[in-house]
């Protein structure tokens, strides 16, 4: 009888260790982020947008990779969008994209090989900032925008600060 108890206790102990081991090994495989953006994660994006953000990744062959993070609060939509593409002539491609900034473009120092910042306001209602830059042969754009023109969380000054932080993060991850 004592022998059966020892065998049963040993079997239960082995089973518990096996299950624990499977949980430790299999757990990280199951616990992955829904968004696989290589340059910025949902937590960082949420901090930049002022609340929990939900990310979406779009990778289509021959097109720029796009990471879009959206944060909704009381009918206000705030979006952080990052696009990255590899260009044969990155300086020319960056210049082409930067034309959308017009005369408003200003150089951003210490971001990638070169970068510009400009307003990205929606004429109808919203407020936004955009960075266009490059790291080696990779051209990137980052836009932070709010659907509310007088957004108390993302004022023009706050947007300028946060777009710079986002640009540091993205350019750093592209190096």
Regions from the language model: what does each represent?
Residues 106-175:
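A short, solvent-exposed beta-edge/loop patch
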Residues 30, 74-76, 89-91, 140, ...:
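Generic "edge-of-domain/loop-turn" microfeature
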Residues 15-27:
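Bacterial N-terminal signal peptides
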Residues 1-13:
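N-terminal secretory signal peptides that target proteins for export/translocation
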Residues 31-70, 104, 147-148, 152-175:
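N-terminal "mature-domain start" segment
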Residues 48, 53-126:
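Short, solvent-exposed recognition patches
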Residues 10-11, 90, 157-159:
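Short alpha-helical segments used as structural interaction elements across diverse proteins
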């Amino acid at each position: 009888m004592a022998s059966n108890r020892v065998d049963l206790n040993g079997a239960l102990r082995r089973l518990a260790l096996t299950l624990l081991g499977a949980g430790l090994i299999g757990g990280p495989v199951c616990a992955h982020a829904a968004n696989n953006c290589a340059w910025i994660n949902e937590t960082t994006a949420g901090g930049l947008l002022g609340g929990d953000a939900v990310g979406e990744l779009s990778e289509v062959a021959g097109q720029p990779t796009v990471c879009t993070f959206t944060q909704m609060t009381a009918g206000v939509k705030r979006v952080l969008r990052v696009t990255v593409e590899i260009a044969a002539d990155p300086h020319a491609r960056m210049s082409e994209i930067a034309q959308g900034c017009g005369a408003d473009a200003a150089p951003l120092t210490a971001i990638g090989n070169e970068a510009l910042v400009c307003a990205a306001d929606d004429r109808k209602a919203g407020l936004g900032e955009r960075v266009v830059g490059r790291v080696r042969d990779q051209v990137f754009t980052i836009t932070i925008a709010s659907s509310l023109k007088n957004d108390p969380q993302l004022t023009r000054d706050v947007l300028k600060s946060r777009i710079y932080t986002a640009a540091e993060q993205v350019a750093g991850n592209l190096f």
